[in-house]
Structures are given as C-alpha cells and as structure tokens.
Amino acid sequence: MAWKKTVAAAVAAIACIAGSPGAIAQQAGTQFIGITGYRVGPYGANGAAFFGGFVDYLQLINQRDGGINGIKLSGEECETEYNNAKGVECYERLKTKSATGPTAIHPMSTGITYAIIDKAPTDKIPLITFGYGRTDATDGRVFPWVFPIMSNYWDAATGIVKFIATKEGGDANLKGKKIVLLYHDSAYGKEPHAVLEAEAKKLGFELKMIPVPHPGNEQQSQWLQIRQYKPDWVINWGWGVMSATALQTAQKVGFPREKMVGNWWAGSEVDTEAAGPAANGYYAASLNLGGKGYPVVQDIEKIVYGKAKVGSNPKLIGTVLWNRGVAAAMFTVEAVRKAQEKYGKKPVTGEQVRWGLENLNIDAGRLKAMGFNTMLPPIKVSCQDHGGSGQVRFQQWVGNEWKSASDWMKGDSALVRKMIEDSAARYAAEKNIKPECMGG
C-alpha cells in the first residue's frame, strides 16, 4: 500500500508508488489519516525522523494487525517545510480528503498549531500536539479540540528548573543563580517565557532570555552575551540546526556543556551527532526514551522493514525522534480504537476521535501490551486535563549515545496548572467561550 505525499502550493502532487517504502494509499472503507509533515528545509532532518517513525507505526498496524479492528489505515502526507502558511494550506487540503476527515492532525509545529487552532472546532478535527503547541490548551473545557497530550512546554520548563535544582543541591540553592534561556525566536521559543519568569520570581534566580533568529545557524552575538553574563546554567530551547550550533558555539567560548540543558525538541541524535564532540556532557529533557530495546520497535524492524519492506529509513530506527513519532502515531491509533468502542468498528470521524482522545487511559499494563514498556509514562486524559501525564525525564549525551540522567519526574505541577487555567480563562473571555466539558 502507498502513503500519498503532496507538497503545499505545488503544481502537481507527488504520490508514492503502491508498495513503496513509507507509504500507505487511501482506499475506500479505510481510516484516513492526514499528516502535515516536513522532511525538507532547515528542520527537515528532525521532521524526517519524527514522521518516519509515525508512518512506520501506522504500517505496523496494517501489516501486523490488519488495521484497527479490521479497519485498515490510509493517508496522505503534505509537506509544510515548517512554514505556517504552508501548514494552513496542508490542513485545508487534508481536511476534505476523506468522508470521515483526516482523523486527527499532528501539526508538529507550534506556529502551525496557533494558525489552525481556531479552525479545529468548526471543522471538528482534533489537534494532537504531543509536547508542543499552545500550553493552555491543556484545559479541555476551553480547548475541547486540542490535545497537548502527555506533557506540555510548561511541564518541560518547570521540569528543567527542578532538574537544575537537583544538580545544585535543592531549590534553596537556586537563589542568586543566573540562568539563561537561549530560545528560538518563534511562537515555539516564546512559549516558556511566562512560566520561567514565574519560577525565577518564586525561587529567586536571575533569568536572562536571549533570542536566536530562524533558523539558528548563526549565534556568535548570543554567545558573546552569554560569556559576558557568566550564567550558571543555559537552557537551550532550540530546534533544527539551532541546537547543534549552540553546542558548537558553547565549546568555542568555553561554556561547559554539563551546564546546558535542552528541552525535548533540542535533545535528539539529530542535534548531538551534528555537533560532534561539542555535545559531550549535554543534558536534555525527553518525552520518551530512545533505543531499540522495546518490543514495538523490534516488531517494526521485523515486520515493516523485514517482511513487508515498507519502512521509511532503517538508520533512524530507535532514535529519540523516530521513537517519538512511533509514540505519536500510537496516540492516534489508540484514540481511533477507543472511539470504535463507542461508535462501532468502522472508520470514525474527527468528532468521534475527539471523544476517544478525551477518554484515553493508557496505563502501564496497556503500554506493555503494545510493546512500549517504559518508553513512555502512563497517560490518562480527561476533559480538564488534555495532557494526562505532565511528566518528563532527563538524559545526557555521553560519547555517542544518550544515557538516562533521571527517572520520570514532574516540575512545578501546581504552578503550571494555575497558569494554564488563568490563561485559558482569558482566552475564553476573549473568544466568548463558555468553559464546559463536551462529552460525546
């Protein structure tokens, strides 16, 4: 089967030949899944890893299981190049491709998420923003169509502060410390500002925020500021080429990578391998663990790449972002499966998938049954909490691999929840929304 690929604003669509690697073609009676992806441009390497894992998992469900309760998966991937306007164009293209819609959209871009977030309720298409997007959308009473599933940016930011505190001997020892937020100058990079300012006020550390213009491959002036400021820690809120450049430039100015912590979009092999020896010692948050030691990864290797020969790229298997793509696809599949429990074993609509997402309960037993084991923490979504976890763990790049640097942990959950509810309430007032649970 072939997964169709298109390019926004292209004269002609690019379609994969049936049976070609990484592709699943649309067929009548299937569950159509639309992907707003990117595999080219300055963020293409990151996107290729994530979406490679995403499509490989969908292939596994078709090849191993015969679909979801007998309903095969089909779909189309539209290339956005991580561009907001192209992301909107891809969204508009994909939403009409099937009688049941695109199932759920993973924008994989905070900017694209903001650009389409007000469209989702009208179009009845759920948005799954796994570890990115608009943080206050975690409050499903105000944002019933948006699911920042598992953990959000404020979970990441407060988790990083807590991790730094453990390295300094406790929260009390953060008082008077200097922390720099080196951030991608975009909606993505600005998302943690408010919560880090609140943490700085609460814990008494100095916070200096330094933007890096897109795409981030020039950082001399930023690191000159950092060298002059002499911070105790640098938080790297990077994406794409920005993260490797930050590590290499830190080495040039003599800033220790053991005092740098990336967020989970600045902590993959794409970043560290590109940085070379400059990455050694660098810490990063993570939404998921990398590695091939999970039954689900081994099934994909054996069935999708081995037997069916429809895998995306064997070199990416088990990397942090590829595993994250596998996990993201699993959330979509499990939401469809949950929706089928209520609405029947047939292709389900976006409205029905929204109910499935809001009622997801993936406990440790279910994770093990699916072959994910400890790759992810348990997740239980509700109307009030469209995240369902709030946990993060940390890893450190040592030599040529990521090694665990913590167990699953939470940052300042009380602060995060209060800020989510306050921000969501302001949005509700602005948009004249009455906060309530939709049900199904």
Where are these predicted regions, by residue range?
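Short, low-complexity disordered leader/linker segments with a strong preference
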Residues: M1-F32, R426-G440
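Immediate post-signal peptide segment of exported/extracytoplasmic ligand-binding proteins
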Residues: A23-I35, G66-K72, E168-K178
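Beta-alpha junction/loop-to-helix N-cap segments that form part of ligand/metal-binding clefts
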Residues: T30-F32, A45-G52, Q59, R64-G140, ...
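Venus flytrap/periplasmic-binding-protein-like
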Residues: T80, L127-T129, G133-T138, P215, ...
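Extracellular/periplasmic Venus flytrap/periplasmic-binding protein
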Residues: K86, T96, T135-D136, P144-V253, ...
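Periplasmic-binding protein-like
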Residues: K95-T110, P126-F130, K178-L182, M209, ...
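Extracellular/periplasmic periplasmic-binding protein-like sensory domains
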Residues: A250-A329, D422, K434-E436
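Segments of small-molecule ligand-sensing domains
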Residues: G311-W322, V333-D407
